[in-house]
Amino acid sequence: MAAVMSAQAMADAVRVVRASISELGKSAKKSDAFSARDLKSRSGFTESVDRLGLVNLQVQARKKRVRGLRLVPTRVVSAIEGSNSTTADAPVDEDVLAWTKAYRAENSTAITRDETLKSNAQSALQWKCVETQVEGERLHYGRFAVSPFRSGQANTVGVSMQKALLGEVEGAAVSCATFKNVKSEYAAMKGVEETPMDILVNLKELVIRSDSDEPQKAIISAIGPGPVTAGDIVLPPSLEVTDPTQHIAYLTKEVSLDIELDVEKGCGYRMGDHTKSGDGRFYIDSVFMPVRNANYSVHSYESEPDVTQEILFLEIWTNGSITPEEALHEAARCLIDLFLPFLHPKKKEVTNSATKMHKSFTMSQFNSSAEMSAKEVDLRHVYVDQLRIPSKAYNSLKRANINTVSDLLDYTQDDLLSIPNFGRKSVDDILEALQAQFSIDLPENNPLCN
């Protein structure tokens, strides 16, 4: 740091500043800020600035006062060697020396405090897709980077995301197949190269994208000779096959193959109830996992001296029914769903003085504005599709522009019933979902209107 400034040198600088401000005229009076570039262009000012070590000079909005000193209205922003830009009031000449010492002591303390806070604070996490590849219709790859983490945090997030990607992300699969004129899964079918068991294995590997949470029906009705592929399946609008060329069977003669498929949505792997199989209806071990594999790695780096941070890399392979980025978003939302119960406030008992009745309302209905704001921040990021309500109720909410749980809490039960095509059963489904996942009840009508 430069040597301590003399009182006379500081006084010279202050006088130059005053003279420069007066020369700026009306513009300086209208605005509380002036340009350091304008001031430095004045004769004699640069020399004073260089002697004092003041490398930046401008008026600023924040004010610092030194106790016990007489201060004048002139405000100077000083950047002493090695210090941050700080605003202080320039005192009269006789107090310059004391002001300088106090300023330096205060500035030194502020620097130490700022550096400590900077080293302890966590910057906002940022994520980016650094690589993506479509290696085939049924194999998509994506690589993502997330940073900055404090030491140890990246591994925690990596383990959680890997497990959520493999076990929590929903996908669609064939759960049951009903063959026409077939009694046993091992019986040979005339004009069909494969046995029913072989066809069931092929159906198990079908990659299907579903936009509905409800079970769906699909039909295979093909006439030979020739191959039967996924593109031959008659699907409802909510279903789509990822790879239409995926093989199902081969018909060697001019015969028909008729199969009815049950398509469901779920997570992970589910064993079919084979004890119910019979009379041409066969249950399949369903693989709902759209994520084929997920890996993560953690790399450390120094963001600044003695401050170590981490970057997390996530690698995701999907079967093509969803993209790796969609899988990443869904896994994160699943983790949020798992942790939300820990954030639920306890119910408060509120007395209705008009009716002398005690009713229990959630904090989302009656509480302080601060608590309400904190709660709404959480629920603004929870979308209504995460309530896992029937598609009819979900579609009605979307048409009413109710996208999040926070939006939903603005409505009473009577308000919901006034939405077109929204019946009592849909309201009951929503009430059940809100109570199960968030311990929230919607009032029948606005209690403030009673």
UniProtKB/Swiss-Prot annotation:
Note whether Nucleotidyltransferase occurs among the keywords: yes
Give the UniProt subcellular location, in the record's own words.
Plastid, Chloroplast
Tell me, which GO biological process terms does this entry list? DNA-templated transcription
**Pfam families for the chain:** RNA_pol_A_bac (PF01000), RNA_pol_A_CTD (PF03118), RNA_pol_L (PF01193)
Gene3D superfamilies named among the record's database cross-references: 5' to 3' exonuclease, C-terminal subdomain, DNA-directed RNA polymerase, insert domain, RNA polymerase, RBP11-like subunit
**What stretch of residues directs this protein to its organelle as a transit peptide?**
1-77
Q: Which GO molecular function terms does the record list?
A: DNA binding; DNA-directed RNA polymerase activity; protein dimerization activity
Q: Where is this region: Alpha N-terminal domain (alpha-NTD)?
A: 78-346
Purpose of the protein: DNA-dependent RNA polymerase catalyzes the transcription of DNA into RNA using the four ribonucleoside triphosphates as substrates.
Name this protein carries in UniProt: DNA-directed RNA polymerase subunit alpha, chloroplastic
